[in-house]
Each structure stands twice: as C-alpha cells, then as structure tokens.
C-alpha cells in the first residue's frame, strides 16, 4: 500500500521539520 506510506511521508505535521 503505497498510499499509506505516501500519506505518512507526505504529512508535514507528522515530522514538523519537513
């Protein structure tokens, strides 16, 4: 499921720095 990974990696709020 690339959608899940893309959603997590595409979430600037998850890292905050990115």
From Swiss-Prot:
Distribution of this protein across tissues and organs: Eyestalk sinus gland.
A Gene Ontology molecular function term of the record: hormone activity
Keyword Hydrolase: no
Cellular location(s): Secreted
GO cellular component annotations of the record: extracellular region; synapse
Keywords: Amidation, Hormone, Neuropeptide, Neurotransmitter, Secreted
GO biological process: chemical synaptic transmission; neuropeptide signaling pathway
Modified residues (Valine amide): 18
Coiled coil: none
UniProt keyword Transmembrane present: no
Chief place where the protein resides: secreted
Similarity section: Belongs to the arthropod PDH family.
Function of the molecule: Causes the migration of the distal retinal pigment into the proximal end of the pigment chromatophore cells and thus decreases the amount of light entering the retinulas. May also function as a neurotransmitter and/or neuromodulator.
Name of the molecule in the record: Pigment-dispersing hormone B
